[in-house]
């Protein structure tokens, strides 16, 4: 009985080996592999969002490489700010980035203030949704672009709608366009390790009596294909005297295929500056005993770095290498990978 079972297993092994050889011959080496052999089980790489709290909430230290990301929320909630900060972080690591501006509303001066190197940024302002997604597909397939932002899904207007009359009803056209594009894109995105971020807007479903009436544009395809979905909301204003200088922001990780979902991050977005990263470092540093807080004074390794949060934040801005050191200690304390990029990134921050 055992001999018969062994012979049967041997036949199966031979048949499997022949099938694998045939598949590799037809589709190339690595098209099928055992889990222990390969690249599949490699640790997921990440790029920082520019917000320490959000990097921690994402569980892997930032947005995953080689995946589709969706960031959605109401108007002026910080969606574009978050993507521009991610572009700046990717550029600090030596990556190439592209911004597909379907809304034709990119503020290049603001992008520069957030640390984006405009000389190295590829920008496209397409006329139709098809053109935008074809450009995105070509950039992904090139394998030479590390991060692509599409701003926004709502502005990806199908060609038939642009060429038609104003009152024409074309139901489901944009949803079909997104579904087809994502079917084409996902394989290439994974193979080339390109991160593609789609910014999306919120709409209200009519006649919803129970449950959440909010939905995102472009159908359901993006919800399924996205590895990470971030819901960003403005929760309050930051004032200096009577003047509003920024907004308090909450981001919820609604979907996460690379770490546990439903975590939240709270941070400040200052107008003209972006996320107050140094403020986050101080808050999380004191919370996890990396930075000592005594009264109004903040200290690190026994040395005082400032009286009051504003002074301590300014001190860390002037000493980026110290800010980086504290941030990495906070990341280690929370079990999140340290920042990549080393001295080059610290120099970029200083300049």
From Swiss-Prot:
One of its GO terms (cellular component) is cytosol. InterPro entries: AAA+_ATPase, DNA_recomb/repair_RecA, DNA_recomb/repair_RecA_CS, P-loop_NTPase, RecA-like_C, RecA-like_N, RecA_ATP-bd, RecA_C_sf. Keywords: ATP-binding, Cytoplasm, DNA damage, DNA recombination, DNA repair, DNA-binding, Nucleotide-binding, SOS response. It comes from the Bacteria. Induction: By methyl methanesulfonate. It is found in: Cytoplasm. GO terms for molecular function: ATP binding; ATP hydrolysis activity; ATP-dependent DNA damage sensor activity; damaged DNA binding; single-stranded DNA binding. ATP binds at residues 73-80. GO terms for biological process: DNA recombination; DNA repair; SOS response. Its main location: cytoplasm. Can catalyze the hydrolysis of ATP in the presence of single-stranded DNA, the ATP-dependent uptake of single-stranded DNA by duplex DNA, and the ATP-dependent hybridization of homologous single-stranded DNAs. It interacts with LexA causing its activation and leading to its autocatalytic cleavage. Belongs to the RecA family. NCBIfam families: tigrfam_recA. PANTHER family: MITOCHONDRIAL DNA REPAIR PROTEIN RECA HOMOLOG-RELATED (PTHR45900:SF1), RECA (PTHR45900). This is Protein RecA. The lineage of its organism: Bacteria, Pseudomonadati, Pseudomonadota, Betaproteobacteria, Burkholderiales. The gene is recA.
């Amino acid at each position: 009985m055992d001999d018969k079972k062994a012979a049967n297993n041997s036949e199966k092994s031979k048949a499997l080996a022949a099938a694998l050889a045939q598949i590799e011959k037809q589709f190339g080496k690595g098209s099928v592999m055992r889990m222990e052999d390969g690249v599949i089980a490699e640790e997921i790489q990440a790029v920082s969002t520019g917000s320490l709290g959000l990097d921690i909430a994402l569980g892997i230290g930032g947005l995953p490489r080689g995946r589709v990301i969706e960031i959605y929320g109401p108007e002026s909630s910080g969606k574009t700010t978050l993507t521009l900060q991610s572009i700046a972080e990717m550029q600090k690591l030596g990556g190439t980035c592209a911004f597909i501006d379907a809304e034709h509303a990119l503020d290049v001066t603001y992008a520069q203030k957030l640390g984006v190197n405009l000389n190295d940024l590829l920008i496209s302002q397409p006329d139709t949704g098809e053109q935008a997604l074809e450009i995105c597909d070509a950039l992904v397939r090139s394998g030479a672009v590390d991060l692509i932002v599409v701003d926004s899904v709502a502005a990806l207007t199908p060609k038939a709608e642009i060429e038609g009359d104003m009152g024409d009803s074309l139901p489901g056209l944009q949803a079909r366009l997104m579904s087809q594009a994502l079917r084409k894109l996902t394989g290439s995105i994974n193979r080339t390790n390109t991160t593609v971020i789609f910014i999306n807007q919120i709409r209200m479903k009519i006649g919803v009596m129970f449950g959440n009436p909010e939905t995102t544009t472009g159908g359901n395809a993006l919800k399924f294909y996205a590895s990470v979905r971030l819901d960003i909301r403005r929760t309050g204003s930051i004032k200096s005297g009577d003047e509003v200088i920024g907004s308090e922001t909450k981001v919820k990780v609604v979907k996460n295929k690379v770490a546990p979902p439903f975590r939240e991050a709270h941070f400040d977005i200052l107008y003209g500056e972006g996320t107050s990263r140094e403020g986050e470092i101080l808050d999380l540093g004191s919370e996890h005993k990396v930075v000592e807080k005594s009264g109004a004074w903040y200290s690190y390794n026994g040395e005082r770095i400032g009286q009051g949060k504003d002074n301590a934040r300014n001190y860390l801005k002037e000493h980026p290498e110290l800010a980086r050191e504290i941030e990495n200690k906070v990341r280690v304390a929370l079990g999140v990978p340290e920042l990549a990029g080393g001295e080059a990134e610290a120099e970029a921050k200083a300049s």
